[in-house]
Amino acid sequence: MLCDRLWRNARLATLAEGAPGLGLVEDGLIAARDGRILYAGPARAAPAFAARETVDCEGRWITPGLIDCHTHLVHGGDRAAEFEARLAGASYEEIARAGGGIVSTVRATRAASEDALVGSALRRLDALIAEGVTAVEVKSGYGLSVASERASLRAARRLGESRDVTVTTTFLGAHALPPEEPDKDRYIAHVCTEMLPALAREGLADAVDAFCEGIAFSPAQTARVFEAARAAGLPVKLHADQLSDLGGAALAARFGALSADHLEYADEAGAAALARAGTVAVLLPGAFYFIRETRRPPVDLFRRHGTRMALATDCNPGTSPLTSLLLVLNMGATLFRLTVEECLAGVTREAARALGRLHEIGTLEAGKWCDLAVWDVERPAELVYRMGFNPLHARIRRGR
């Protein structure tokens, strides 16, 4: 059988659906043609391949390319000065009254050109790519006007044109109130009738997100956004139950959301609802760490009910200025007490599920895109165990 490229003498963590554990294969082989996997499994069971190029992996481990399924890569400015103020004892409320917080990022994002947004986001994206990331989700949400949200989503699309990476875009117009609009209901009406339909028509968004929280939008307001997304034919995601239990997990499940993210305050009913709906719980330990949260997501409840769990950086300027998915692996284990298997599945198979792309990425299985990360480690657990260490040997996207 003819193939473009063959990786031999490799150890595989396939993460395949239904495989025990990480789907480990000690003497493995991967064959690819036209960017897709033809075979991934034991060398002894492989068909006879005639390869244009053969790569000897010398016993290295291969995993699926890593996936960061929750980021806010596109934004103007930073919030380093606020970080210093917080260290000096200033509260979030004091910072906000002084013109800081998310409003400061909105102003900086609106003031930046689309080219400038692309340039700054590429620096953050490059840090992720250097750790084996082959797919990333990018949200808008710092423009909060049709023009600025359009620019943010266009910038996100351009990231995938500028780098060899799969980019999924998410419209997050219901992120916060813009500084010029004091009325939440009126703003949500604008999101639903003007912003979302326009950006959906232009094909700029692959999904729609919202922030359901006391400091953001109510469950009823969030439901209006999700109804508008449904009318536009777009799947939904939700920032849910991060700071309080507003029933966000159950709301996400009711709308069949791809994912519900954060979830520190989710309850058992919410965990069960997520499992029934097939909605992935995306856990974000970077934000938990950075803003010194003390309440962990209810991981034991997710396990009990069979809720799928993913991990992501939540890279954003205010609460998680983090561009290391490898560090997130360690944080997931140490802060949230996930197992090695849960962590690695959380940045591959379950992250793909959270983006609605499991049919094409996230595991090493025939028919999927040949997105690989090759690692200089003795065992996959090292990827979770080590901190501040990047053992990536090679990153392959679509067989190249």
Swiss-Prot record:
Q: Where does N-formimidoyl-L-glutamate bind?
A: 142, 316, 318
Task: Explain how, and how many, cofactor molecules are bound.
Answer: Binds 1 zinc or iron ion per subunit.
Q: Which residues bind 4-imidazolone-5-propanoate?
A: 79, 142, 175, 242, 319
GO molecular function annotation? imidazolonepropionase activity; iron ion binding; zinc ion binding
The residues the record assigns to binding Fe(3+) are: 70, 72, 239, 314
Query: Looking at the keywords, is Zinc present?
Result: yes
GO CC annotation, single:
cytoplasm
| Swiss-Prot/TrEMBL cofactor(s) | Zn(2+); Fe(3+)
* GO aspect biological process, one term: L-histidine catabolic process to glutamate and formate
Concerning its family, UniProt says: Belongs to the metallo-dependent hydrolases superfamily. HutI family.
Role this protein plays: Catalyzes the hydrolytic cleavage of the carbon-nitrogen bond in imidazolone-5-propanoate to yield N-formimidoyl-L-glutamate. It is the third step in the universal histidine degradation pathway.
Q: What is this protein called?
A: Imidazolonepropionase
| Natural source organism | Methylobacterium sp. (strain 4-46)
Upper classification of the organism: Bacteria, Pseudomonadati, Pseudomonadota, Alphaproteobacteria, Hyphomicrobiales
